[in-house]
Amino acid sequence: MNYHRDEDYLKNESMFKNIFQKRFNLIKSHSRSGISTVLDVGCSNGVFLDLFSGSETWGVEPSKIADRAERKGHMVLNTFFEQAKLPENYFDLVIMNHVLEHMDNSAVVLTKAYKLLKPNAILFVDVPNIGGLGSRILGKHWPYLLPKEHKHQFTKGSLTKLLEENGFKVLHWESRSGIFEFANPIRELGRKRFLLDLFAIPYSLTATLLGMGDSMSFVAKKI
């Protein structure tokens, strides 16, 4: 998938729900004590937060689309994460879904996330995988490169090291591409882009099985 913007969320909300459902399931499998409070950094229109029914949902979103998330009942701060005034030692989960690569100082951002989380709480990070198969094959044409927008690129090793240096223990890591991003690929059958995803299955399957997909997820615990 290419890098997504606010208009992409609005036009393809059901597709993103399918993607986020898989990430939600992954988070839940590592949150044995439950999630009563969740913060989504870069929450857009709140489509990821929508999955956390019964939880107190917070978001940080600097763009105007924050209004849509707020209208859904999420508590949203319309500012940048670095400037956001948020309660410390409060959240069971902080989500950074394709956000960390945009930040000026990744270490500062992770330090702030650490302070916001309760002891032993969970940080979920999803970022492009520059160590993946797509990046190696396509080089400067890799769609996730976006040098004007992505200030950082990460490999499994580099982000694991960064998380550990900022007080986190990685509980789980995985990498995926194509239809393997979806919780239920069958739901995408009516979408035009899904035909391209089907043709790309040999690549997507190989990349996913090798742990060299275009995106990667980290579930980390505050220690």
Which residues make up each language-model segment?
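Conserved N-terminal segment of class I S-adenosyl-L-methionine
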Residues: 1-97, 106-111, 175-176, 184-189, ...
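A short helix->loop->beta-strand "cap" motif at the edges of active sites that frequently abuts
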Residues: 55, 118-121
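S-adenosyl-L-methionine-dependent methyltransferase catalytic module, highlighting the catalytic core
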Residues: 96, 104-112, 122-223
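Basic phosphate/pyrophosphate-binding loop/patch that engages nucleotide-derived ligands
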Residues: 115
